[in-house]
Each structure stands twice: as C-alpha cells, then as structure tokens.
Amino acid sequence: MNKKGFTLIEVLVSLVILAIIAVISSNILKSSLETERITSEQLESIKELSLASSIIRRDVRQLVNVNSRDFYGNNENGTLISEINTQNLIFNTSIKSISDQISPIKRVEYILDGNNFIKKQFFSSNPFSPDDYTKIELIKNVSNLTISFLHKDTWHQSWPINLETSKKIPVLIKIEFFKDNKNYSWILDPNITHALQN
C-alpha cells in the first residue's frame, strides 16, 4: 500500500527540529538585544563624559584671574575658590556672548549636587543674586568626587591655601570621581602663571 503523505513520526521529528531552531534563534536574538543595550549605555556614558570633559577643560583654559565678589559685594578670598570638603570649584571664565555689549567674563561653579556633577553659569562675573544662573547637568550618578590643586609640587584639597595663593591659579587641577564601577581622573592645566596684581 503506497500512501502519499507524512507519518506521525515524521511530523513530530519536524516539529522538534523547528522548536530547537526557534529556541536557538530566540536566544541569539535575546543575546543580541542585551549586547545592543549594554553597548548603547556605554556609548551614552562615553558621550556624557566626553562632553563634560570638554566643557570643564574649555572653562579652565579660558579662566580669568580677576577679583571676585560674593553676593553682597564683599571681596572673595581668592580668584579661584574651592573650600575643603565642599566638592565644588568656583572661578571666572571668558564665555562668548551673543552681544558685544555684554561682558564675556562669567562666574562658573562646578559642584556635586546629590549624585550629579553640574555646572552653574552665572550671568556676570560678580552676580548679585545666588539664583541668577543657568544649570547644566554634566555627569549623572557620580560618587566620591574630589578636587585637588597642585602648588609647589604638592596636591592640596582646597584653594586658595594661603594669602599668597589667593591671587594665583594652581599649576594643575585634578578632578577624581567614581561612576559606573570605574574611577576617573582628569588633570586640567589652567596655564596661567601670573598672579593677580592689585
């Protein structure tokens, strides 16, 4: 008897083979999607760090060694300020303005706000209101931020360190932090060797 068609065993074997192919394909797809997600997160982190590094390096490179005043008009104790254990850095920098009628010198403050490293840019070098600034979130999920200053071959945790250094800019600025289970260390060179003359 010659019947045309498939036997039950042939159909079952075909279904088992198709099921194995489907499981392998879904595992490959799941693995590919996970790899793509991890790669995208790492790329976003690299872009975030690169942009933050560019912004702070530009501001430090264009740092202006001029007297600063607090929000009450009193002279600050330095031209670049970072008090110990505050995780912030305050200085004046030259930032291009849309209008030539506005001074390009603006006060900037880099600070750890919660777990985010942010930049506050004030509208002038000596602002009269502590609330008149724009805020840029540079790096998210930062911990263990430390800022150090090189002076006479020694790293210091605050600036200025004395009356003599209050009119100077440190030779180097080091910013260290921890993000995504990695330690980062940036060394910034202000390249300003002269002291402020009054």
Which residue ranges define each predicted feature?
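A short, polar/proline- and glycine-enriched secondary-structure boundary/capping micro-motif
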Residues: 102, 127-136, 158, 186-187, ...
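N-terminal single-pass transmembrane signal-anchor helix
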Residues: 2-29
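Extracytoplasmic/secreted proteins and extracellular or luminal domains
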Residues: 4, 135-138, 168
